[in-house]
Swiss-Prot record:
The keyword Ribonucleoprotein applies. One of its GO terms (biological process) is translation. InterPro entries: Ribosomal_uS11 (IPR001971), Ribosomal_uS11_bac-type (IPR019981), Ribosomal_uS11_sf (IPR036967). The gene is rpsK. This is Small ribosomal subunit protein uS11. Pfam families: Ribosomal_S11. Part of the 30S ribosomal subunit. Interacts with proteins S7 and S18. Binds to IF-3. Belongs to the universal ribosomal protein uS11 family. GO terms for cellular component: ribonucleoprotein complex; ribosome. One of its GO terms (molecular function) is rRNA binding. Located on the platform of the 30S subunit, it bridges several disparate RNA helices of the 16S rRNA. Forms part of the Shine-Dalgarno cleft in the 70S ribosome. The keyword Nucleus does not apply.
Length: 126
């Protein structure tokens, strides 16, 4: 019995969501369709940035560029942006989405804020 390779279907998606998770240590961007099925994703660690370089705005810009290039092969043109986390790569990633030719329909901050839940970690002293 011959083994046949299953061909991956090319999705044709015009509008989707971009989730930007910007932490103090890394930036992860996931591009989905409107139902939430992932089209592409990229992270600064996966693109070769190491250590403290992962959390820079340039790394976030590069991550956004890589994730959008993969998603544009599926025909993506308009996006809703959801930003989560306190990282410094937030603005540069959003700015890169516009320069890559995507039309940004909306931007929402979905950073989870506790209603006095867990005790926060100790403050940094530099």
């Amino acid at each position: 019995m011959a083994v046949t390779k299953k061909r991956k279907e090319k999705k044709n998606v015009y509008e989707g969501n971009v989730y930007i998770q910007a932490t103090f240590n890394n930036t992860i961007i996931t591009v989905t369709d409107l139902q939430g099925n992932a089209l592409s994703w990229a992270s600064s660690g996966g693109l070769g940035f190491n250590g403290a370089k992962k959390s820079t705005p340039f790394a976030a810009q590069t991550v956004a560029e890589a994730a959008v290039q993969k998603a544009q092969q599926c025909g993506l043109r308009e996006v809703h942006v959801f930003v989560k986390g306190p990282g410094i790569g937030r603005e540069s990633a959003i700015r890169m989405l516009g320069t890559m030719g995507l039309r940004v329909r909306s931007i929402r901050d979905i950073t989870p804020i506790p209603h006095n839940g867990c005790r926060p970690r100790k403050t940094r002293r530099i």
